[in-house]
Design a protein with these regions (language model features):
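Glycine-rich FAD pyrophosphate-binding loop
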Residues: 21-42
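Dinucleotide-binding Rossmann-like beta1-alpha1 core, especially the glycine-rich loop
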Residues: 46-126, 254-255
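Helical element adjacent to the flavin cofactor pocket in flavoenzyme catalytic cores
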Residues: 137-176, 181-196
Length: 357
């Protein structure tokens, strides 16, 4: 019998496991993959966001700003590599500049510090190989390795007594009651676990877990983003993430370039709604789009710089027809006692993981 069963061993589930491991609780994490951080948590740009892209008063804005401000301390505690590089959101047209000013004002409402609108000369001072007529400069944006980060939190939780059960996909949940307690019976493909509490951190499958307990109001719409990884020869020319002005109707922040903590460069992601939650394929059409759009901001890339490609899937609560973003859903359910439901945790989930916990 466990006090708490966490479903999902990504960055959110592992952050919660680490936080709860500080208390005298018997905790397990049920992860359907063979390791932690195999899905959304590990298939992204690895950016520590500042919080200017999110609507004021939203949970996304609140947790992103808090997560950014406190990340130096977290990185030190976990002994993980992290670099506060800054970030440029570059524009070319009058409409772009108006949007950048709006983003700056929104960020300041959210509590983001140090934002500036800068001209072309200042762009060249900060990142000489990035193109743009003007930009929003965010000095507090950073980069990290999401795998190393998530694994470090999971290892810390395990050191404190948390049990991780990998390759354990939840297939059914029943809520029974004995004379003293309400007990969840969680059936996986491998075993049956009993727990007093459940925390649903299942990411792409969080709606599926909710439906096992009668929660029908949420549907996750998988939105795939494809990336190229560039050789480290290119990495020395890009010292901070460079983004375009985002299209509010799209499911992401636009095709951008991000230096990795290891010295490579990511181009991407695209934004394409798909039917399957496990279709991590890549397509030539999208790869051509990455080259075209990425080259507008950073024209120094060549095909010989490409090492490999990959994709990730965003767990979006908004359908393709609606576009844009919904807020994080984090609920202590009144209709299901002892059940905490987290769903729609897309970007900036990586930045927000510790405050969410």
């Amino acid at each position: 019998m466990y006090d708490v069963a966490i479903i999902g061993g990504g960055v959110i589930g592992s952050s919660i496991a680490r936080e709860l491991s500080k208390y005298k609780l018997k905790i397990c994490v049920l992860e359907k993959e063979l390791d932690v951080c195999c899905e959304t948590s590990g298939r992204n740009s690895g950016v520590l966001h500042a919080g200017f892209n999110n609507k004021p008063k939203s949970l996304m804005a609140k947790f992103c700003v808090e997560g950014n401000e406190n990340f130096d301390e977290i990185a030190k505690e976990l002994d993980i590599p992290f670099k506060r590089t800054g970030k440029l959101v570059v524009g070319f047209t009058k409409e772009d500049k108006e949007k950048l000013i709006e983003m700056k004002e929104q960020g300041e409402i959210n509590g983001v510090k140090g934002l500036e609108i800068i001209d072309k000369d200042r762009i060249k001072q900060l990142s000489p190989y990035v193109e743009g007529n003007f930009a929003l400069y965010s000095p507090n944006t950073g980069i990290l390795n999401p795998f190393i980060y998530t694994i470090a939190m999971a290892e810390n939780a395990v050191e404190n007594g948390v049990k991780y059960f990998l390759d354990n996909e939840v297939v059914n949940i029943k809520k029974s009651s004995d004379e003293d307690n309400n007990i969840f019976e969680i059936r996986t493909n491998k075993n049956i676990y009993k727990s007093k509490w459940i925390i649903n951190c299942a990411g792409l499958n969080s709606d599926k877990i909710g439906k096992m307990l009668g929660i029908d109001e949420y549907t996750i719409h998988p939105c795939r983003g494809e990336y190229f990884i560039l050789d480290q020869k290119v990495g020395r020319y890009l010292n901070m993430p460079a983004y375009p002005v985002p299209n509010p109707k799209m499911g992401g922040l636009g095709i951008h370039l991000t230096p990795s903590i290891d010295g490579n460069v990511f181009i991407g992601p695209s934004s394409e709604y798909i039917d399957s939650k496990d279709d991590y394929s890549t397509t030539k059409e999208v790869m051509d789009l990455l080259i075209k759009d990425g080259g507008r901001i950073f024209p120094h890339i060549r095909k010989e710089h490409f090492i490999r490609n990959f994709s990730g899937i965003r767990p979006k609560l908004v359908a393709k027809e609606q576009g844009g973003y919904d807020d994080f859903k984090i609920e202590l359910r009144e209709d299901i006692s002892n059940f905490i439901n987290l769903t729609g945790i897309e970007s900036p989930g990586l930045t927000s993981a510790v405050p969410i916990a």
